[in-house]
Each structure stands twice: as structure tokens, then as C-alpha cells.
Amino acid sequence: AECIFLSQGRVINLQNLIKESEEIELHKPNTKRCIYVASRAIVNIDGVYNKVEDIIEESKGVNKVGSTKQGIGPAYAGEALRTALTMGQLFSLSNDQIDQKVSELCTVFPYLKKEEILQGLSSAKANIQALLQSGKIQIVSDDFLTTDVVKGKHILIEGAQSVGLGKFGGSYPNNTSSDCSLHGILSACLLPKADLCIGVANAVVSKVGGGRSNTKLED
């Protein structure tokens, strides 16, 4: 792959983004590969949305949905409530504006600690700023895949769980929090169509975490 694009439909864990950029450099030193991140991608840091998801999951007792506790669901909830911080906002808003966004987040999820979030954001932002300056990471417009940068190139999109665990086609509530069907993927990437769609299926259905499985044998 010449480049990696994280679309607006993604939740970006800042610590993981830094780590993965370092791993690319480790395995491919002096590479010209770059991680492009959509400005509308949602920001997550360790101890924020994953903490929220952990609290919610544990409160369910024996009725846990099988969450991976990465904070994806609460991050999308934050986006719907317009309290989430995007990658573009992280580098365009003033410190006072970011402070206000975090205050709004802590109003929705009162068990979060504002100062810890601000400290985590500041630390991760400084590290990512260095990667931006080196060209290892670029924050781009959400319609990046339709720009001249990728014109004439092949685009491979990872669909992950697809319909079986999707927000609309999955076995609610034991499903993921995004629409990972073909239509949802194209929408998140702002692409009008797919030229070729390849479906891959296992002989035995598997899933991450616990929860109901429609093909599970009990005997």
C-alpha cells in the first residue's frame, strides 16, 4: 500500500495512532508511506471512551453484550450528541475551545475527570504534532479518496465485521456501533460506489467478545 487513510467513520485512539506510525517506521525505515487521517475522524484517548464503555458493560452483570471495551460505542454516541472532538478540531481549536468541549463531554459522562482528559490530549497532541511536521501523518479533508492524490489508483477498503455485526443488520444489542455494511463503508469514505466488492466468509462464524451468536451450538 502506498498510503493508509483513516476515514471520517473511524474512531482514532491517539496513543494507538502514534504507536502504529512508529511501527511503520521500525519495519520500513525511511519509508515514504504516510497515514492520512480525515479531519472528521473522532478522537479517543486511553481512559476516556473506553472507561465509559467499561463502566457500562460491567453494570450489565450477566447481561453483558460482549464489548471489546475500546470505547467505540461511546465515541459514536459522543459524535451523535456533538460532544466528541474530531482530529481537525484537535489542531484547529484554541485551548479554551478544547477545554469547553471536554467540559461538555464530562457533563454527559460525569464519572470522567476533566483534568486527566486534558492532560492526555495535550501529551498525545504534542507527539502527533511532531509526526505531522515530519510528514508521517497528515490530516486531510473527508473527501480525500475522491481527490487527485488518489486519482487512477486502486483503493482497498477493509470492511471488518460487515453486516453480521453491523449496527443495522447485526444481532442487537450484541453488535458493533457502526454501519459496516457495503453502503455504510462507502458512506463513511464519501465514495459514490464500489467497482468490485469481495465477500469473505468463514465456514464457522466467529466473533470478538461474548454475547449471542446466531449459529452457536449448545449441545
Give the role of each language-model region:
Residues 1-219:
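Non-transmembrane, aqueous-exposed alpha-helical and coiled segments at domain scale
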